[in-house]
């Protein structure tokens, strides 16, 4: 018989120890990976609920199993909130991840071998936008577009490529681009050749929800996002659309289930519903505004200290530090900062001479530090510490000194108070 008092700590000490160590790591390390964030205890409560027990293949009101009357309410809440938050008239909250949401869009709109225009991974794109190691690069004919010498999307080249290759779909969106995308311009280019415009806004969804970054939903045929990252919800995916046909929406639904997934994760969908409600609160807008301010503050320090920032700045939550001129690799920088309890990720920079496993840059994002309560002053102080480490990358005394400062500020700004 199952009892409420059953717990992991008393049953599986080895697993519990790893879980507790991760909790301590999160509290004692500064998180600057742009795709990571801290979700609320309400979201975690939803994910640890009895909803995890329920199979619910299908969609609200059209399930293949009985006993779905309450999970139907949960999923419909998530759908309605997603539509309201992003100004959409269609939402599918079932994708288990952003990549699976993207897979569903490809499946719904394309046939294998169709031509797709996607942002070059080396210029800030994502694996699912056409990388040869991903399903998107294996199943479709990918034509990459990129950024110009200033570090911004080269719309003239994008338009030229579109007219030359006549893709069936153009992908907007990124995993490491710090500028503002002109969604209207991308739709104009797509319309000029009769292509779909598909936008993956996974990185900026929270900023979009708060009105800090332009909303692609009115411009794109289909939009996907993750529900974590800047949106600060559970790990999962979401598909949105506005002004499309019922036929398109049916195709998208069918591409998710049964096309790519079986039963939805109802406990995660409940977490999405909570996070979407949280994103409608006034404090969420204030939070996202601070995310952008903190990113700009950090860039300012890196530039003052003589570091090159791709595109010269940032208009969202992330930026790339180009270490080529410093004769450092991203791998070295990542490791040294990690020893100081500062977590970043190595990242390729435009025209990177190093392999993706080594790279010549680091990607820095501010959603997680802002969630802890950091403002511009703390963000600038942190950027200065990072420069200290990078300036003395082989000096363990410097790294230990910065680690002490990190532990102190983490204690003052806990993740969960």
Curated annotation (Swiss-Prot):
Extent of the signal sequence: none
Family according to the record: Belongs to the SHMT family.
Keywords per UniProt: Acetylation, Amino-acid biosynthesis, Cytoplasm, One-carbon metabolism, Pyridoxal phosphate, Transferase
Location(s) in or outside the cell: Cytoplasm
Gene designation per UniProt: glyA
Gene Ontology CC, one term: cytosol
Source organism of the structure: Escherichia coli O17:K52:H18 (strain UMN026 / ExPEC)
Catalytic reaction(s) noted: (6R)-5,10-methylene-5,6,7,8-tetrahydrofolate + glycine + H2O = (6S)-5,6,7,8-tetrahydrofolate + L-serine
Protein's name in the database: Serine hydroxymethyltransferase
């Amino acid at each position: 018989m199952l009892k409420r008092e059953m717990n992991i700590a008393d049953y599986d000490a080895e697993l519990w120890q790893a879980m507790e160590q991760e909790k301590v790591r999160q509290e004692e390390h500064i998180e600057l990976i742009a795709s990571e964030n801290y979700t609320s205890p309400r979201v975690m409560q939803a994910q640890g609920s009895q909803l995890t027990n329920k199979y619910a293949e299908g969609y609200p009101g059209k399930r293949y199993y009985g006993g779905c009357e309450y999970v139907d309410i949960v999923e419909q809440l998530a759908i309605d909130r997603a539509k309201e938050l992003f100004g959409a008239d269609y939402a599918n909250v079932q994708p288990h991840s952003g990549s699976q949401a993207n897979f569903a869009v490809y499946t719904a709109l394309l046939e294998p071998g169709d031509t797709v225009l996607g942002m070059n991974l080396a210029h800030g794109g994502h694996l699912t936008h056409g990388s040869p190691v991903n399903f998107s690069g294996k199943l479709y004919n990918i034509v990459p577009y990129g950024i110009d010498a200033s570090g911004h999307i080269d719309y003239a080249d994008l338009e030229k490529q579109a007219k030359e290759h006549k893709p069936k779909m153009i992908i907007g969106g990124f995993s490491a681009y710090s500028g503002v995308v002109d969604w209207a311009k991308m739709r104009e280019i797509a319309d000029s050749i009769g292509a779909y415009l598909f936008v993956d806004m996974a990185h900026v969804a929270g900023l979009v929800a708060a009105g800090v970054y332009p909303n692609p939903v009115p411009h794109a045929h289909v939009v996907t996002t993750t529900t974590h990252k800047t949106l600060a919800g559970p790990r999962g995916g979401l598909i949105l659309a506005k002004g499309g046909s019922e036929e398109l929406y049916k195709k998208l639904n069918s591409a998710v289930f049964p096309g790519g997934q079986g039963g939805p994760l109802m406990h995660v969908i409940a977490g999405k519903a909570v996070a979407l409600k949280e994103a409608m609160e006034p404090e969420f807008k204030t939070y996202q505004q601070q995310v952008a301010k903190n990113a700009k503050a950090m860039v300012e320090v890196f530039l003052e200290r003589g570091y090159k920032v791709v595109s010269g700045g940032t208009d969202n939550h992330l930026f790339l530090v180009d270490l080529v001129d410093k004769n450092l690799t991203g791998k070295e920088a990542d490791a040294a900062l990690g020893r100081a309890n500062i977590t970043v990720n190595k990242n390729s920079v435009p025209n990177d001479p190093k392999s993706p496993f080594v790279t010549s840059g680091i990607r820095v994002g501010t959603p997680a530090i802002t969630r802890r309560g950091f403002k511009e002053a703390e963000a600038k102080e942190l950027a200065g510490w990072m420069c200290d480490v990078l300036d003395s990358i082989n000096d363990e005394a410097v790294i230990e000194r910065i680690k002490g400062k990190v532990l102190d500020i983490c204690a003052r700004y806990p993740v969960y108070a």
